[in-house]
Amino acid sequence: MPTINQLVKHGREKVKEKSKSPALQGHPQKRGVCVRVSTMTPKKPNSALRKIAKVRLSNGIEVTAYIPGIGHNLQEHSIVLVRGGRVKDLPGVRYKIIRGALDAAGVENRRQSRSKYGAKRPKAGAAAGAKGKK
């Protein structure tokens, strides 16, 4: 326990907040180049082949990023925009690729939550035809 004099002289050390996405270095997004595009299996109770990409960011750091949505057009040397945000059942994946930006195309035939997947607004006629399908 410090004395009052010690506190006056030195003060208390602030606890630094640890970043959840350190590779972005405080930026909201970073551009990167896909080094490798592959799949990965999730943690214990879940089972799937989640699509991931190893991305070399513009600051030289290499990260593993998740490719959200159904289907993608990414391959090696694709330029992508990466944002923070982990995937709970994939250990070590702390970043996501933004769909609909740079080389990552938006998700096809996406009707709901379109903004999250870079999907354009469907034509009025196309939406009416798809409404009956369930």
From Swiss-Prot:
GO MF term set: rRNA binding; structural constituent of ribosome; tRNA binding
Superkingdom to which the source organism belongs: Bacteria
Ranges of Low complexity composition bias in the record: 124-134
Single Gene Ontology BP annotation: translation
Region (Disordered), start-end ranges: 1-30, 106-134
InterPro entries linked to this entry: NA-bd_OB-fold (IPR012340), Ribosomal_uS12 (IPR006032), Ribosomal_uS12_bac (IPR005679)
CDD domains: Ribosomal_S12
3-methylthioaspartic acid: residues bearing it: 89
An annotated GO cellular component: small ribosomal subunit
Alphabetized UniProt keyword annotations: Methylation, Ribonucleoprotein, Ribosomal protein, RNA-binding, rRNA-binding, tRNA-binding
Bias-annotated ranges (Basic residues): 112-123
Alphabetical list of SUPFAM superfamilies matching this protein: Nucleic acid-binding proteins
Membership in a protein family: Belongs to the universal ribosomal protein uS12 family.
Primary role: With S4 and S5 plays an important role in translational accuracy. Interacts with and stabilizes bases of the 16S rRNA that are involved in tRNA selection in the A site and with the mRNA backbone. Located at the interface of the 30S and 50S subunits, it traverses the body of the 30S subunit contacting proteins on the other side and probably holding the rRNA structure together. The combined cluster of proteins S8, S12 and S17 appears to hold together the shoulder and platform of the 30S subunit.
Subunit structure: Part of the 30S ribosomal subunit. Contacts proteins S8 and S17. May interact with IF1 in the 30S initiation complex.
Protein name, UniProt field: Small ribosomal subunit protein uS12
